[in-house]
């Protein structure tokens, strides 16, 4: 009499999922977080570049009569925020630098600054202007970190962006 032999390969699907599935899920979430961080970094760089380009073509000749195309810090900031879809204006800090000096503000506060920029004499054709942006980024991956409680947080990374142009008009 022969007995049917059970398969020698037995396993527990719950245990196998725990050992393989959870690290895979964590890897996927980590990949999305890295992509979100790089998206913010690239968007910030693009937005600051667009703001600097916009300011560089609104120089001294825009403020001379009969032209009325001079721009303010508020208008440049709005241009940066329009180009930077998803950038939080309450965290984005901007620094406007020209030959005459530097202006620092959070994007929310910059939106109410009606100072013409770049001001004379820094708005002369050929002068350099620069806009710097800084965006703090904190990953939400700590929510998914195994064994973490409510007190576990990861550090904040500052994403810098800088753009320099010469005044063209």
Where are these regions (language model features)?
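A generic fold-level signal
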Residues: 9, 124-126, 158
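Intrinsic disorder/low-complexity segments enriched in polar/small residues
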Residues: 5-7, 131, 166
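Low-complexity, S/T/G/P-rich flexible repeat/linker segments used as non-globular hinges
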Residues: 62, 139-169
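Surface-exposed loop/turn and secondary-structure junction residues enriched for glycine/proline
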Residues: 20, 41-42, 57, 90, ...
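Alpha-helical assembly-interface signal, strongest on the long, hydrophobic N-terminal helix that forms
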Residues: 2-81
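Short amphipathic secondary-structure patches
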Residues: 52-132
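A generic structural signal for short, solvent-exposed coil/turn residues
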Residues: 36, 86-88, 123, 153-157
């Amino acid at each position: 009499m022969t007995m049917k032999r059970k398969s020698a390969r037995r396993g527990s699907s719950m245990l196998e999922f725990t050992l393989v599935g959870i690290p895979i899920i964590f890897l996927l979430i980590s990949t999305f977080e890295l992509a979100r961080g790089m998206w913010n970094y690239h968007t910030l760089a693009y937005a600051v570049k667009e703001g600097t380009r916009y300011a560089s073509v609104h120089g001294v000749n825009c403020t001379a009569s009969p032209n009325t195309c001079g721009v303010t810090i508020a208008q440049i900031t709005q241009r940066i925020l329009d180009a930077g879809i998803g950038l939080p204006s309450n965290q984005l800090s901007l620094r406007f630098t020209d030959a005459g000096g530097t202006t620092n503000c959070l994007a929310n506060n910059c939106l109410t600054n009606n100072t013409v920029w770049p001001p004379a004499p820094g708005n002369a054709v050929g002068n350099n202007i620069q806009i710097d942006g800084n965006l703090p980024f904190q990953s939400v991956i700590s929510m998914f970190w195994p064994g973490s409680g409510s007190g576990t947080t990861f550090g904040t990374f500052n994403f810098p962006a800088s753009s320099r142009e010469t005044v063209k008009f």
